[in-house]
Amino acid sequence: MARAKLKNSPSESNSHVKTVPPATTEDVRGVSPLLPARRMGSLGSDVGQRPHAEDFSMDSSFSQVQVEFYVNENTFKERLKLFFIKNQRSSLRIRLFNFSLKLLTCLLYIVRVLLDNPEEGIGCWECEKQNYTLFNQSTKINWSHIFWVDRKLPLWAVQVSIALISFLETMLLIYLSYKGNIWEQIFRISFILEMINTVPFIITIFWPPLRNLFIPVFLNCWLAKYALENMINDLHRAIQRTQSAMFNQVLILICTLLCLVFTGTCGIQHLERAGEKLSLFKSFYFCIVTFSTVGYGDVTPKIWPSQLLVVIMICVALVVLPLQFEELVYLWMERQKSGGNYSRHRAQTEKHVVLCVSSLKIDLLMDFLNEFYAHPRLQDYYVVILCPTEMDIQVRRVLQIPLWSQRVIYLQGSALKDQDLMRAKMDNGEACFILSSRNEVDRTAADHQTILRAWAVKDFAPNCPLYVQILKPENKFHVKFADHVVCEEECKYAMLALNCVCPATSTLITLLVHTSRGQEGQESPEQWQRMYGRCSGNEVYHIRMGDSKFFMEYEGKSFTYAAFHAHKKYGVCLIGIRREENKSILLNPGPRHIMAASDTCFYINITKEENSAFIFKQAEKQKKKGFAGRGTYDGPSRLPVHSIIASMGTVAMDLQNTECRPTNSSKLALPAENGSGNRRPSIAPVLELADTSSLLPCDLLSDQSEDEMTQSDEEGSAVVEYVKGYPPNSPYIGSSPTLCHLLPEKAPFCCLRLDKGCKHNSFEDAKAYGFKNKLIIVSAETAGNGLYNFIVPLRAYYRSRKELNPIVLLLDNKPEHHFLEAICCFPMVYYMEGTIDNLDSLLQCGIIYADNLVVVDKESTMSAEEDYMADAKTIVNVQTMFRLFPSLSIITELTHPSNMRFMQFRAKDSYSLALSKLEKKERENGSNLAFMFRLPFAAGRVFSISMLDTLLYQSFVKDYMITITRLLLGLDTTPGSGYLCAMKITEDDLWIRTYGRLFQKLCSSSAEIPIGIYRTESHMFATSEPHDIRAQSQISINVEDCEDTKDVKEHWGIKTGHHRNSCSSDQSEHPLLRRKSMQWARRLSRKGNKHSGKTAEWISQQRLSLYRRSERQELSELVKNRMKHLGLPTTGYDEMNDHQNTLSYVLINPPPDTRLELNDIVYLIRSDPLAHVANDGHSRKSSCSNKLGPCNPETRDETQL
């Protein structure tokens, strides 16, 4: 900045001059901090306005200097340039005016042609008109008709005025856009055309005889096209529209076609004035026929000038039009890739949701569309997919199906770009679903991308509801602002953990969160498939109690009373409520909760109440001797979805026989008979209001001394006391606090290692620890923070101390310090480094003492070059363990749900082939649960986290589903809310007979709500080949193994049962295949040194013996040899007990008349014991005087009844 120092003159000062303190030496070198900010004005609204002048005082002893900025823009040329070119609005007006002038000149030319009559004579202006008709008969071409036309004076005056304006405007624009090279401006096509159409008219002003001279004014159509292009560009720039390439190209193509046709029509018509004098319409007809390549030949030019023009026009069309079409096709293909735009008008008049994904796969797309459009009220919604990658072939093929092409719009773009969010009209969307890419190798990076997308959408459209899927639990707190968040690893590990204590919890939850009508498998000849498919249609619904026909009549009654009678009368299962003044959902709040009309009821049923029809029928009242009717509901109306509601039995019992039962008694024990010995067993009534003196069994937080004494008596040694509290160290931010069983003091890290002794203990294998309960082994690649959620549900406070299973983490990589810090407070939690493809690792971690082995999907194998190959290693390893340890319950997580058909694969099993056909049939029928009949899924042995994607989609309609699922999984604990558990039906419990009577028994005795049954049936899987008798007969167990088995069963408390032969004929029929299988299995273990010096005779005998043995014996021998090599006792390896000839499935909310069967496992929602402690002021002794249930705290939590 140049600075000057002038003497201070009072006469020069004025009120508009701003003074500042004198500048120092340092200020002269740089910009003074006192410089005022530059004021910017709108170019559109303040055209030509200049910033005001600023004055700076350089020194107090000198005069002030006024400095004016942007003086270069104050010149006359700059002001004109600003008005004609730079300013968007004014330049748009100028171009619109210019475009109108060009169209007007073309219109005037048409008027001149229509008024022109060559037969009246032609010639110069004010000259005598001469008729050249006779002369022209001797010559073929009348050139005078080409050079001279008849132009009326008013028409000439208007054309001259327009030409003069156009000429002046062109000269002005040439002057303003001059950049040093005048020839570049002169030789432009637009300038040459402008001169041809304007200069001759200006000349006629000064030379009147030339006023009838022909001037090709019709060429102004090309100038109008050029002006229109510029005008559209200015318009898009003014309205900030950037995605206009396709529109511009289509407009250019249409204008080019129109200009070619108009130029050809006018040119041919004028040249034919010297021939047969074609009319303007006939010339237009000829051009259309010619350009459409039809060429009828009824109208043709007769003279060579017009013929030459036709040739020229065709050549121009052959050059120009292909270029235009090529550009249009290219833009069309690009638009097909990018998806175009979702118009603002559609966004304001239609409802749409936006799906943001990093990469769109066909499975994810179909899961979303099937689940989203399964709800009737969402049929009119549109789905806008915003994805940064190009649409793959499979997705493109699906989106071309009419069912989806009318409702799904694919946009290629990024959620981090506001212009792409604008294209998707995110601010008008009903919801935005942001899904993470779970198949990425770096799942943390995938979460980071999801977080940025969520932030970008929240910043752009703060009022749009957000539904976010996150992978890692430690990243969840970054998106807490979202309306609904599903953390994949939290749900996955909690579900896998509950699968170990409540079998097939993963199947139960998956069926609940999938929308189905219960029509799957109804045409199957198998009874279990029809019943399983029918019950799979049950979902969770909600209704306000005051508006409900199901629950309205139970206002003022207890929750337990309402649940039982609603199930008895309508077949619906009431599982929870939400108070109007409280936003928390309570699962089974217990009999203390009194139902109010404002409560929101959550229930399980085939369909919601609003879609149900009620058929009321008057039934005969049952009259039984000695039965009081207080607990019986006389209204027999029910939903038509249940064919028969069985008799609920008696509801009265003698209260004098309800004293406290012994500790080892079952809560479903047969009531003592009174009076006549042939009297039917009775069940206690479900009370309308809770009796505070006889509510529930003793709470779990009381009588710890008794619990400890019982444990001490069993072990005969000192027992480490457990305390109940909240884990002191959470591995990540945002984990829900859960009351758990904890160690009084944290275990040292060295004690957490299972296979290595330390100074605190010398145990090096699971056998040495002498655990009372079976192990739960978890195989994972790394000890991620999500694994913490596997431990917490298994150590929750409501689980009895007797039922706590030791947990062994089999990790590929060593866990980090912070993870060990988080788990060291939990009892009986250990880890070990190893993999499931190493037999030694499996044996050292105690697999033969385990009931459940959980195989977690590895992050490093989630992506594969070939689709669906990510699970190959896991499937093969699990199949190996299935062969080696047939009695083990293996729960496997897969990346792709379609691969579950390979679990426990039997190539020659005709029954599995029949199930495969059933799955294909259900998929063709459009079922969302086509995979449900696969035996591993039905039994809860396989799970894929992608099955829970529908949980997020369902939350759009059912905003409570995520909360209920987290409560069922034990991820969240709400005071007063119950928890999911299971109980097993034994022979002593079969007197109850039906599920409806079981519902009454549980509601009346312990206020538990059953929601389903896990049923296991024996089934013979027929093979396609005859059985090998040798394989079935050559099974022997030596005396030593029997003694070892007996010893381990006495020590581990295992109940012996009937064993089945699990050998299959197809495996034993081919010894070569068995030998290959043996070699493959041996590669899993570390072999010792081979012994030498054995004789050939001994080798031949061993080979003959190996040939005669079955595969089962070979694998058993392999396992025992490795155990001996590792120094492990071979006791406990039961080679006979397996589950290969059984099938299991889940029945959600079965009808009340469903018969109970032996070994059924009933899913229960048990009320929160802490709620009763908080609400009841009675002592533990008064709680133990329960008249309707057992008094021992352990009895209430036993799963074995």
UniProtKB/Swiss-Prot annotation:
UniProt-annotated stretches for the region Disordered: 1-28, 1175-1201
Residues that, per the record, bind K(+) 3: R753, K756, N761, Y769
Cytoplasmic side: 1-92, 176-184, 230-249, 327-1201
Residues reported in the UniProt entry to bind K(+) 1: V294, G295
GO biological process, one term: potassium ion transmembrane transport
Record PTM text: Phosphorylated by protein kinase C. Phosphorylation of the C-terminal domain increases channel activity.
Compartment(s): Cell membrane
Residue spans crossing the bilayer: 93-115, 153-175, 185-206, 217-229, 250-272, 305-326
InterPro entries registered for this protein in UniProt: K_chnl_BK_asu, K_chnl_dom, K_chnl_Slo-like, RCK_N
Glycosylation sites recorded in the entry for this protein: N131, N136
Pfam name, any one: Slo-like_RCK
Domain notes: The cytoplasmic gating ring domain of the closed KCNT1 channel harbors multiple K(+) and Zn(2+) sites, which stabilize the channel in the closed conformation. Under low-Na(+) conditions, the abundant cytoplasmic K(+) ions stabilize the gating ring domain in a closed conformation. The open KCNT1 structure contains at least two Na(+)-sensitive sites in the RCKs where Na(+) binding induces expansion and rotation of the gating ring that opens the inner gate.
Role according to the record: Sodium-activated K(+) channel. Acts as an important mediator of neuronal membrane excitability. Contributes to the delayed outward currents. Regulates of neuronal bursting in sensory neurons. Contributes to synaptic development and plasticity.
Name assigned to this protein: Potassium channel subfamily T member 1
Organism: Gallus gallus
Gene that this polypeptide is encoded by: KCNT1
